[in-house]
């Protein structure tokens, strides 16, 4: 048979010329299709509980059935020769011409009829490829039987190639076809647009996050979080002020270190209290990002991690979204995430509150999809947060801060550890928050309804299919003899009848190798597990939920299976105790074998005894082969409490397929478990750090290291030890000869067998191929090692160990345990002189320092290489982005002389020198290079500003672009809706919420915040889009301000649209004066300019015309201003006047103006641009504007002249009534004035009398004071008796006077 190959653009098979004038057939291959001659082995539908580890065995079963069709009574057909035709987007399996079933190659001269095929399906529906490690010519792929039905089963198709080198070619070709088909499907379609518009998007301001203890939020949680964020911001500003506002100092002040004690990292409850250590004991091991701020580090990795102090977990993966961000952006984000900064602790920074950085752009797009929430950063053009609805427990809105809301979700900073995080956001106003909450509620309800409709695959710990999954995981990558041992251990957990049944079936098929026997056993095990799974009762499910017809069978089978589980546990405990006894025999046997290599393998096999098939299932069992979880092998982790995971310090990270060979507990093996110090990868030597040493029988080699890792494929254990612990623990007879051969070879060769390690090279191990491990030696053994070890060691190996190992002192001549770190081989190599030891120690220190220096230099080199790669990738991305932006056909050609002229002019742009406008006009007329168009626009804007100074009252607000992006806009809904409508076919803007749309959102949002009067109006998005295609965001923002304010385009976007009405009148007058027939034709059909010309003015022709033409129009607009639009419109209408006149009705004319008119060729566009340069209508436009205002005033005046008589009479009657009212009011006013005058005269009289009385009172007071002085003097002169008599006399005189007065008052 001919060697397989991929023949392109030629018919298959064999390189023959295609038949001339072959008739076209429905299924005929097209030029460019790829065809491969293969053998179709067969296919099979998979059980929904089939996982990835089971697939190789299923593939082997299909292959075996094709080789032996009658085996197992399956009656499967033999393999047939086929042609795999890759015709986009289909993958078609066609029978090979002239080849019978199971036959050889047929006639190669026959053209294959691709219209008749065995099966076909779309390439993008293929989900996974499977290789056969035992036979590289076999491969398979998985595909859904019904791609449109998510509940459909998976199908597996197996093929065989005649050459192993053909398999990668076939797979890569299918993958390329699949990618091309997926890319074609991802193009904007109606369904995609509907999905895009159905997902609600809101602009929010990210405030921060707080760790909470419960998944349900109290009503005041959002307000409490907001208060804490405000407090943190005040502290930050205060500290920044104390440091003098130095950004570098601020960085250090706000950094926080990991808490010293576990209690410091406890999260805070919603009410402000801190949990007790008992509430969350596992939080003590949380990383810094989960418990305290790390503000400086977040400044570096902010694009991926939106949190200022700590971002998301590094293990969190961002899915590649075709509608959100490119893979390059995500790669940059992930690389930025790897950067870290040193941290310092500050006492005032809270450890549980994680606010965002107010100095960064915290505005995000909050997208609510069907099943997830996405937080997209328009600043970094990436998805910074993605949460599924199943991880969100509650949403709430602020009470005091009504414009804030948040949600609580579950996160896992470490495997097996989960916590609840509350993310807080702010919206522009309260109504927007209400809309967000309503959208979330509806989305949750819809997702719950859709999820409940799906059939969930249930798995529990006792599921038969789950036990099969664990077994396939356990034997994956093992050699057939060792896998056979694991399978036999699993079979021992079955009942006696099941074991006997499987044994009989396997023996009937007469396997000839261990691999074939394993495949047969797995086949029957899978059939047994599928049968048991049908009647299996999951844990927690009672028989009450089962129908009456199946209750007896299910109950008995469920009870039987639970009984089997208990039996298995008892068997495992008994087996482990027996194996502990057998292991002692293995220890004695090691002395007889005299080889540490075999002992190491025996220990590695003994470590397999702890692997139990009854491990607990994962929390979320795999639902399908595509989503099946790859769990760590049970061999990788030790359940013993004395072992703990060590840090990897080797030169490359550990792979998931590594195994650790661990010695077991001392009670089981008669050994102690020493604690070993981790060795470095550079020296590749394992130095002991424990004081305990093993006491073993005489051997020429030391024990293997406890924590030496070996990759699974490189493990080569001797065959006689692979069944050492099988059944009774005795060696099987078939391996006795191998034992003798191994013993003889190892006794003759002192080095033994060398094993390759996956973590270090052979030179890093000792001469025997095993790492050095401490053991207890007596003084006799020490003397023996001094004498015997050099015989078995080569000088090179001794010298290598002497140079590479650290020195320790000699063991004391005593059987007691040593008092310091010791190692037998090092002791032997050590000298007796103290001076030699000191020198060697110094030498070891120097080596360590040299190694450290080399490591640091290597790290720096790697970092520099990474930075260079990033810079190179950034340059490539920039070039690619620029290429995508400028992907349009340019109108006109630009000569080399024009490029040189423009380069000279752009130099003046930097120096701000005025240039001759006639020269600029001439150069612009000759052409503009597409690559320098953005710079030329900036140059033209600068020249305009140098000649025209905008008044201060018309100047835009002086706010920077970055500051505007930090704010929230009220125009977000209108902007977000128009993103998908702006240049929907251009590759830069076609990606939904891609880099182009997010840049456009930023630009439109910034201008809406800058110009409060205009805000956002439809049409500005196209103008901004054209600017973004030729320059960066900030430059486009400056040019947009120039167009709006300096050139005056913002007038036509005002809410009253007055300027647009004037422009429509001016265009009508131009048509009336210069193209009267066309004007009359349009008027007869009632077609006003606002019907077809409004988009031309609002979008500057960008919404309907080709980008090359629009770019040339923008060239002239930057030079001449708004009148260019009238010139272009007039030229367009005049050039197509004859065709417009041929349209007879309203519909035809409108269709022509909207569809046919923009579809021009390059020649017509160049002609129009030339006419625009030669046209001058500025005077006419000014005259028409004045005319419009005059007509508007006349219209207002004429409205007053047309008032009728009734209105006049009403006004006269109203006037007479008002006159009478005025007269009455005047009379009342006169009376009031007279009263006021009388009151004023009375007031004057009273004031005069008051003044007189005050003067009289003052006189009387003076007299009183004089009399009082006289009385005092008289009292001093008279004696006391005379004075008393005088007082009595005065009383008497006073009483009669009073009596008379009273009598006078009586009537």
From Swiss-Prot:
Entry GO terms, CC: cytoplasmic vesicle membrane
Keyword terms: Acetylation, Cytoplasm, GTPase activation, Methylation, Phosphoprotein, Repeat
Domain PID: 53-209, 319-475
Post-translational modification Phosphothreonine, affected residues: 575, 620, 649, 770
Localization of this protein: Cytoplasm
Residue numbers of N6-acetyllysine PTMs: 484
Biological process, per Gene Ontology: cellular response to insulin stimulus; vesicle-mediated transport
Pfam families on file: DUF3350, PID, RabGAP-TBC
Positions with biased composition (Pro residues): 13-23, 615-624
Protein name (Swiss-Prot/TrEMBL): TBC1 domain family member 4
Origin species: Mus musculus
Gene: Tbc1d4
